[in-house]
Amino acid sequence: MAGVPAVRISIESACEKQVQEVGLDGSETYLQPLSMSQNLARLAQRIDFSQGSGSEEDEPGSAGRAWAEPSEAEDEEGLVKFQPSLWPWDSVRNNLRSALTEMCVLYDVLSIVKDKKFMTLDPVVQDPPPPKQDPQFLQLISKKKSLAGAAQILLKGAERLSKSVAENQENKRQRDFNSELLRLRQHWKLRKVGDKILGDLSYRSAGSLFLHHGTFEVIKNTDIDLDKKIPEDYCPLDVQIPSDLEGSAYIKVSIQKQAPDIGDLGTVNLFKRPMPKSKPGTPHWQTKLETAQNVLLCKEIFAQLSREAVQIKSQIPHIVVKNQIISQPFPGLQLSISLCHSSNDKKSQKSASEKQNPEGHLYVLEHNLHQLIRECHKQTLSSVVMPHPASAPFGHKRMRLAGPQAFDKNEISSLQTNEGLLEKIIKQAKHIFLRRRTARTIDSLASRIEDPQIQAHWSNINDVYESSVKVLITSQGYEQICKSIQLQLNIGVEQIRVVHRDGRVITLSHQEQELQDFLLSQMSQHQVHAVQQLAKVMGWHVLSFSNHVGLGPVESIGNASAITVASPNGDYAISVRNGPESGSKVMVQFPRSQCKDLPKGDVLQDNKWNHLRGPFKEVQWNKMEGRNFVYKMELLMAALTPC
């Protein structure tokens, strides 16, 4: 046996690790063994602290039963485990439970002593004997208490009523932001861009081609403290407009006689207009937006006028300096169109108050400029071809009628030439200036010359380029007899058309002197026509009549007119010559029998020659009695008329 070699035997230790998983290839995955701390924690988790602890005698039995039940279950499964005779953690559990109970009791006692909500540690004091009180004093105290209680109830009720009234008033004054935004949408175009609400002030939807965006922003008004009393004009909504549209603006149109120096062309005489007052019930944002939109429209008008002033070629070029356009419609006359924009800052208000000069501003032309720019917007919209039926021929109606109703070259050229905004306003300014000059000329003649009287009746139905006035020349007291001079003045852009009663038409230029000379000549002719009408009424005979006398001194203004009338029996004759400058000259011719200073000769022997009238004698017209020329002529004719 000694010579037999030793045989190596492989001894494999028993697997102390539990198998977690066996793979398909036969490999086993083991669980790591628990450490001492993990094993202690696993055992502590098996302790039931909620189970009440009994007597010491019962505890081993109960613990034995608790440990016996799992051991029996393990025996049934075929597993053999170590089972101690007594539970090792039983004393630990009991001590922990008793310590927890004592700590809870200590915490309750400390909290009660500290807070004194349920128990106070005060010594017991004997109650003092009740003092003896007077019954009347007790009755007074009870009445005071009852009155105080009633007063307190009344005060609480009054305070509650006042609070309810104040809350109702605040609820009426305080408007909701959404309802105010709905009102804003009813008047202005709004859109949502991100978290902002933007609106549109421009006239692009009406046909405007102005490049300004005209956008405003709707914001919430947070400048007021809701805890305090809300003012009457409080609005939860506010609008924020661009800085260049703040304040107020207007287009100033003025006509001046003398052109200023070239260095003063850029200065504009501003006068501060009062801000438009909001109507009762109108929110403040409505007035603010309307003012900003007016500023935008004024800027568009001035930009259009400036562009046309540079493009139009005229004999006298238009001048554009800063915010002012200078034009000369007539020689020695200047038309100024200015954009006046005053912001809300104090400097602009101070400068505007220092330069107040509203006298030269023509509000009519400013209003016409707004109308003209709106007409341009309307034409821009109308130029777009609107939807039409598919069966109808495509194109404009004028083009469809070009075959049967064709236009000639002049009509087509007239349709293609469109006047600009500046040309139209210059023509209107010319007409307004010519109309004012005509009215001033007529008024000056009426105030300067009392006999004959001149009356002007202006027509209410006028055009922007034409007006009419009816001029009557009469004598006081003889309006029914003297109706021969009736003139119709049609005032145009650059000339005045005068229509006489008999249909004759005379064209006058824009010069004031021409109109004045014409009216003076007509007033001179009126006196002669009045003598003619008076002679017919008095029974006198008209021997000669002429509106333009070729004899005598030459008048620098028009021509003199003359008339000769004879008495009913032919004994007397009156000759009247009236000129615009020389005035009236009246001469009377008497019979030869009444002329004592005639030389006697032997040539005329027959008495029939004595019936001829003698030479004319001039009447000292200044010494005649009467309020006017026609009345003096009536007295003279009455004196020379035989009974």
Curated annotation (Swiss-Prot):
Keywords annotated in UniProt: Activator, Nucleus, Transcription, Transcription regulation
InterPro entries xrefs: Mediator_Med17
Gene Ontology CC entries for this record: core mediator complex; mediator complex; nucleus; transcription regulator complex
Superkingdom assignment: Eukaryota
Stretches for region Disordered: 50-75
Location, primary (coarse class): nucleus
GO MF entries: nuclear thyroid hormone receptor binding; transcription coactivator activity; transcription coregulator activity
Keyword Transcription regulation part of the UniProt annotation: yes
GO BP annotation list: DNA-templated transcription; positive regulation of DNA-templated transcription; positive regulation of transcription by RNA polymerase II; positive regulation of transcription initiation by RNA polymerase II; regulation of transcription by RNA polymerase II
UniProt-annotated location(s): Nucleus
Function: Component of the Mediator complex, a coactivator involved in the regulated transcription of nearly all RNA polymerase II-dependent genes. Mediator functions as a bridge to convey information from gene-specific regulatory proteins to the basal RNA polymerase II transcription machinery. Mediator is recruited to promoters by direct interactions with regulatory proteins and serves as a scaffold for the assembly of a functional preinitiation complex with RNA polymerase II and the general transcription factors.
Annotated family: Belongs to the Mediator complex subunit 17 family.
Subunit organization: Component of the Mediator complex.
Name of protein: Mediator of RNA polymerase II transcription subunit 17
Species name: Gallus gallus (Chicken)
